[in-house]
Amino acid sequence: MNAGQPITLWTVEDVSVYLGVSVQTLYTWRKRRTGPPAGRVGRHLRYDPDVVRAWFTDQSKAA
C-alpha cells in the first residue's frame, strides 16, 4: 500500500461482476465461508481487490 494513496475497496457488486457470479452467490459463499474474504466498513461488505484476485487464482489452480 502506498502512503497517501486512497485505498480502493470493491463492493459486493464489483466482485460479482469480476467473478461473473450473482450477488446472492457471494452472500451464500460468505455464509458458508467458501468465497473470497470480505471485511465490514460500517454495515457494508468490502473486498480488497488483491485478495479477491489471489483467491480466484487459488481456485483456478485447485480446479
Regions found by a protein language model. Give the residues of each.
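Polyanion-binding surface elements
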Residues: 1-28
